[in-house]
Amino acid sequence: MSQETGNDNRPQTNVRPGRSRAALAIRAIANRIRTELYFLLRARFVKRKGMVRIPWSVELWSPHNDISLGDRVQFGPGCIVNCDAQIGDSVLFARNVALVGRDDHRIDLPGVLIWDAPRGDSHKTFIGRDVWIGHVAIFVAGVHIGDGAVVAAGSVVVKDVPPYTVVGGNPAKVIKKRFEGLSAQ
């Protein structure tokens, strides 16, 4: 089995120079404890399939306590999930990504103040596997994000995103296919 080497012919690793493997192991244990405490104290209703990395600053809330997370999901600091959501395996959220409700307040009731209006219908958001979401992206509830998609920083996603595409903008539009000329698997 061959291993890639760096410029100085040493095997490449994810360990930063000057950082010991023991320090990384201790940090990994501390992260696992922090994650378990997060779900125990703040988000018992969330269903998890496997490893999740979640900073304390992330807010998970759902009108029907219906959030499920796949294996290897990582949230950046300040992310917000305020809708029912199903998130697949191997999904990366950058900082301050928001999944927000679509009909949190009914605005179509004459004579009823928005403050007093009941909640509208709830829409579940689906994020496929192997998805990368950039800094400060916003998703309106009810969208489906296909497997392998990349959402650029600052995007506002109001429509479904096809698999293996890169989208960006406000509203988000397809920028390109991830694997031009290849059949994605």
Feature map (PLM): residue ranges:
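Secondary-structure boundary/capping motif
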Residues: 49-50, 70-71, 128-129, 136, ...
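Hydrophobic transmembrane signal anchors and adjacent membrane-proximal interface regions, especially
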Residues: 11-15, 43, 92, 131, ...
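Extended, small-residue-rich solenoid/repeat segments and analogous flexible loops
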Residues: 6-63
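Amphipathic terminal alpha-helices
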Residues: 2-4
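Generic structural signal for short, solvent-exposed loop/turn connectors between secondary structure elements
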Residues: 38-51, 78-87, 185
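Flexible, glycine/small-residue-enriched loop-and-beta-strand segment within the central core
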Residues: 56-69, 74-144, 170-171, 177-184
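Short, highly charged low-complexity linear segments
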Residues: 6-14, 110-117, 152-159
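C-terminal/domain-terminus segments
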Residues: 142-168, 172, 181-185
